[in-house]
């Protein structure tokens, strides 16, 4: 008997199943109740459901539809040892074997085409698997060369390819049993009534799922005369919607005013997916259909939509009223992924705080692109203080430890293709078990980062490896050349010398010799595996690869033991599966790597954790009712686009009802989520482009939901509004735009900011309070260096020196590529040294050799070009400096300015004033530094012009000042310094840029005309925001923490600070 229980509630259907089990118990107490579904999460839910009813859940057996069908094949065909040898892997290798034969595809015979062969074989294996399940009659007819002419000539190569696979399988005496011919055999046995009923299960329950295809349904229908089959069919539609949907049309041209159900694309999409059940199950008069629908009593928008699906009333188009207080459906437009999770967190807090009936376990968050959100989820949900923590669980396919082991395995397997970039190699030491294997401590790993930067190790093991990668054969920037430098440095005892064309480093001493040895050992093992993995080998050779790899790289312990076993088991399964195809040629590890990771992640290992907010993929919800369902990442990229490789897929050319369709599946999952949400359905997506903040459209499914609501609902009094006007009002109400700085404007989670600052800054003292810090600022002695450093960047100095807060030293970022260009920091250092050598008439040839061997200059003519260009530029500056540099006087100072004592050193005092020089352009910080020194020089009686010479002979100078005036100015800057310790002073580069535009030197005033103001503000904003080539001042971490928003209030403060402190500098320009 085939009985269909049809309902819009999973709990109703499970209750029916429970009553059947209770009312008709098996005579054999050991016989298990069988449930068939394609996701273990539902089985987990079923066990909890039954346990709540009965007090215990036992004697249940869960089957995936594929597994159960093969179990039936074994029973009905009396083949206990029956195996499905036509696996995806087996078909791949069979096709590769065929492609190796020149007779089949002439253009795929070369060895260098191995990866192309694999990709083609992988694609065709996937397509053939679909043919076997969805067109078994094709496969059976092809094998007996029947009805081939119905296919176009340019499609018949697929038939020949399949025939070749079957021929090769029989050739090596392997079974040619696959689903298609077993399906045919079972149909024959059922027709002949030769089934032995006693071996079949007495009854089983099937839950409607994506894995149900027409062939499976036909088998179940045919055996229902021998056993009781209960089909639990979950659908929001009480009546059959298919009478209202045109065949083979998902979307129709919507005529807004036409009252037709076809306008409801959401309903159409769901209906298209459910056609399989209507045509293969519900239409059959042999089957018994029992409706068990429940109407939603709630009057919310969400409940009314579900009732529309349930009732006949949705066809009349009588609009229902939408309450302004109704928040059961919300659509949130966010700035980026982090912001999207921040907004979600705040919303979940509201759900939990305002609804005592909602617990964390009543909430599920789904996304089609969950992997891309994991880091943001962990960051936001783990950063909040304990009082506001929401327990959560991310349903990943592997444990965290297994994910790390898989990452390491993938990295090592990729060594054959690797350039051995420094960061890529050092990342392996971030895995504790690998670091432990080679005996590296955390401190030693930090030292390695420093060594690699100093020795300019970039990529490549040695010159041979570079040659293998088809690059010029030289040892510059390679690992072993860098190690030579380290060994020479150790031998030279902390001195910097050139020996045999190698420059030693001055930072190595004898105490670090052991660390050099560890590094050599680590690189040698990596080199061994690079060579091993670069060679083609037989499949049998690769079988033991994982155990060998673990032995060489990992310190075995109980923490990773289980993960090692999981991965090793899967690796051996993949190899054994491949060996069953009897492929006898050598193969690249790259192909096995692709197969392994595809197969590993293709399996569904997801679980739910009770009592917490679960993050998962939409298909894991499995009709399970939740009070709150949130869908994140629903932008226009969340639905898969057309796969152009499907041009090979004949199912697309000759479609039938029940064919798998990814687009329909994603659409169905979206509407299923809406249907399973009991109280709230929350949607969010990123609505702004990362590039230029332009508008990004949501998924078409979100648009269709809005369209459906617009067609069926309106606010009170809006009954006569046009579709367009009604759409505007509803969209404005349901869609909320969230700003980038969401958290700074949210009172409920202020603690996040504090945690954020703690994460971003390193406190050098514990339990620091602002009051205590300010009390310490009573010392009247001021070092000139401190005064200058403060005025160069007041906000940074405020954090560093008085709050004792500094940016946390993140893991050192090292350059990964060889230096064709000199990085800005090295360029600055080289130019300064070069200018110093030219001014002091030192040997610049030796300096060039030093920088070339150190690796800081690019190799060969790249370095020569840089050096020659900068010699010319530095000579121009040096000539200008030498023009003014007559004396080299240096003076210690100790000045009393009222109650303050200033001490320090003034250097390069000339008879004409102070002289300073630099290799780059003169900035506002250089001006203010020279200005403060010039004030002290003037107080001491100096009467010359102080000047600074910069790039391209640029000169900034200050005119002579009398002592009294200089004293007054300096006192003001000292007072500003003291005040700047108590609260941040908004003196910035942006403010200086603004002032340069508005200050009138001739009249010593601020220009207030409209044109000048606009130009000045544009310059300020440009300096603050930057562009694609120049980093804006807003990226400065200290400013970012102080000036969180560039609003009118903050811009005014920036301009006022610039006006007060920088006008004296412009006014006294010489």
UniProtKB/Swiss-Prot annotation:
A biological process term (GO) from this entry: double-strand break repair via homologous recombination
Coiled-coil stretches noted in the UniProt entry, renumbered to this chain: none
UniProt entry keywords in alphabetical sequence: ATP-binding, DNA damage, DNA repair, DNA-binding, Exonuclease, Helicase, Hydrolase, Nuclease, Nucleotide-binding
Pfam families listed in its UniProt record: Exonuc_V_gamma, RecC_C
InterPro entries recorded: DExx_box_DNA_helicase_dom_sf (IPR013986), P-loop_NTPase (IPR027417), RecC (IPR006697), RecC_C (IPR041500), Restrct_endonuc-II-like (IPR011335)
GO molecular function, one term: DNA helicase activity
GO cellular component labels: exodeoxyribonuclease V complex
Subunit text: Heterotrimer of RecB, RecC and RecD. All subunits contribute to DNA-binding.
Its job: A helicase/nuclease that prepares dsDNA breaks (DSB) for recombinational DNA repair. Binds to DSBs and unwinds DNA via a highly rapid and processive ATP-dependent bidirectional helicase activity. Unwinds dsDNA until it encounters a Chi (crossover hotspot instigator) sequence from the 3' direction. Cuts ssDNA a few nucleotides 3' to the Chi site. The properties and activities of the enzyme are changed at Chi. The Chi-altered holoenzyme produces a long 3'-ssDNA overhang and facilitates RecA-binding to the ssDNA for homologous DNA recombination and repair.
Note: In the RecBCD complex, RecB has a slow 3'-5' helicase, an exonuclease activity and loads RecA onto ssDNA, RecD has a fast 5'-3' helicase activity, while RecC stimulates the ATPase and processivity of the RecB helicase and contributes to recognition of the Chi site.
Family statement: Belongs to the RecC family.
The protein, known as: RecBCD enzyme subunit RecC
Biological source species: Buchnera aphidicola subsp. Acyrthosiphon pisum (strain APS)
Organism lineage string: Bacteria, Pseudomonadati, Pseudomonadota, Gammaproteobacteria, Enterobacterales
Encoding gene, per UniProt annotation: recC
